[in-house]
């Protein structure tokens, strides 16, 4: 493939020409350029045409995705917008919006740092820490990742190449942008893409299945595990015995004989102290239901694709996790399960001795501390809206130190009080 030149004009199917400004980056499928089209700046992905298995089918799928538009209005997706004309040698590309500033790649978040260009020419690159502003923000990011893939799957499409390079995340808010959407295809269709080792479902690694919704769900579990535990769910002592991860070793450890690092029935691939310290430390911190979800995903879920956790169930668990966070007045932030239980609805902070009370809300146990919030998916049965706030713990304006739950929804709640009386709580 001939690389594009600065100032080169690329005809676009929708009319007009995109003018190349500079290169932004390159990967296995092609090169991404900054271009100007119709008075606006876009990113142009220009393909290495020889690396596409069936260019005509791939191009037609891109055109169909452009016509369909991104799921749910496209706010979470860097979606293909315009297709270029094909050159005589068959080369082509597509235009997409630029990722806004303030977002970091999943890879940088996973590594905990990124390298930035120096302010002055000739100076060394600057290493910057990359981490979430809070535990709440990290869980918000996890919810937004799941939400994006739920929207994609509900639209009848699968991502097919889910990996750590597929996301940009605002570490201040948890907002997520899904990129590399050019391989998205209707569930059941595939145009040659397989995925990245470590993220691909074992049946894809073995070559006995094509990527689809069920394999997406395996990859989604990998992404969430990496986000929470900063490690690979299948990389432990067994994998470390391989000096070099060759294609054959990838096939063995991620395809034919994958073993979860915390498989309850197989201890052959446990995390190694000094190498997998993040996984060892963080695995103990998360509540049992989260550990059980990942254990299911990487044991039974490896062998049985239909047993993999669906997006709706991930959202329910992540909402429980979000509500399990306790911000104690002493500054300690931890999950509810980390606090000492002193009664049916009472806990104590081991750090400062402060009492913390909880309240049952449907299937959730909600810690009651100033600023704690309820969400629509919690207060309304059958609803999975995890963004709309429907209630909050507030302090009584007349009696300092007295707290209550304010109904911020449009519905009247039925509340069971400590004296066992059932009362209505209006908005």
Regions found by a protein language model. Give the residues of each.
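Conserved C-lobe activation region of Hanks-type protein kinase-like domains
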Residues: 224-291
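ATP-binding glycine-rich phosphate-binding loop
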Residues: 2-40, 74-75, 86
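Conserved structural core of kinase catalytic domains
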Residues: 78-137
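Conserved beta3-strand ATP-binding lysine motif
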Residues: 45-50
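Conserved catalytic-loop aspartate of Hanks-type protein kinases
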Residues: 216
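Forkhead-associated
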Residues: 400-427
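Conserved activation segment of eukaryotic-like protein kinases, specifically the C-terminal portion
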Residues: 190-207
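Catalytic-loop of the protein kinase fold
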Residues: 140-142, 149-171
């Amino acid at each position: 493939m001939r690389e594009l030149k600065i100032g080169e004009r690329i005809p676009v199917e929708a009319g007009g020409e995109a003018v190349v400004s500079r290169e932004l980056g390159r990967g296995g499928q092609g090169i991404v350029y900054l271009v100007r089209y119709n008075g606006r700046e876009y990113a142009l992905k220009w393909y290495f045409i020889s690396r596409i298995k069936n260019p005509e089918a791939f191009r037609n799928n891109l055109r169909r995705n452009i016509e369909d538009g991104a799921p749910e209005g496209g706010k979470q997706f860097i979606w293909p917008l315009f297709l270029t004309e094909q050159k005589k040698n068959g080369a082509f590309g597509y235009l997409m919006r630029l990722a806004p500033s303030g977002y970091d790649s999943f890879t940088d978040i996973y590594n905990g740092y990124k390298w930035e260009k120096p302010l002055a020419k000739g100076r060394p690159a600057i290493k910057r820490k990359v981490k979430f502003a809070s535990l709440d923000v990290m869980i918000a990011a996890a919810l937004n990742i799941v939400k994006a893939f739920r929207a994609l799957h509900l639209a009848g499409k699968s991502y097919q190449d889910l990996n750590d390079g597929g996301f940009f995340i605002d570490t201040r808010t948890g907002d997520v942008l899904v990129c590399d959407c050019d391989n998205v295809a209707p569930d059941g269709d595939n145009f040659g893409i397989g995925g990245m080792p470590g993220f691909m479902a074992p049946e894809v690694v073995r070559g006995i299945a094509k990527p689809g919704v069920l394999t997406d769900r395996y990859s989604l579990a990998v992404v969430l595990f990496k986000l929470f535990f900063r490690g690979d769910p299948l990389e432990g002592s067994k994998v470390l015995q391989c000096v070099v991860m060759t294609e054959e070793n990838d096939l063995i450890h991620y395809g034919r004989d994958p073993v979860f690092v915390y498989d309850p029935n197989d201890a052959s691939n446990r995390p190694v102290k000094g190498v997998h310290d993040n996984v060892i430390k963080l695995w103990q911190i998360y509540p049992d239901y989260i550990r059980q979800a990942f254990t299911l995903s990487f044991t039974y879920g490896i062998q049985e694709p239909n047993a993999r956790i669906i997006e709706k169930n991930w959202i329910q668990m992540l909402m429980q996790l979000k509500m399990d966070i306790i911000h104690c007045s002493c500054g300690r932030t931890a999950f509810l399960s980390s606090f000492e239980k002193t009664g049916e609805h009472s806990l104590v902070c081991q750090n400062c001795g402060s009492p913390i009370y909880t309240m049952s809300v449907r299937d959730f146990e909600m810690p009651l501390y100033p600023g704690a919030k309820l969400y629509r998916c919690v207060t309304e049965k059958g609803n999975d809206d995890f963004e709309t706030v429907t209630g909050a713990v507030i302090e009584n304006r007349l009696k300092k130190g007295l707290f209550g739950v304010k109904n911020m929804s449009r519905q009247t709640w039925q509340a069971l009080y400590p004296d066992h009386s059932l009362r209505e709580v209006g908005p």
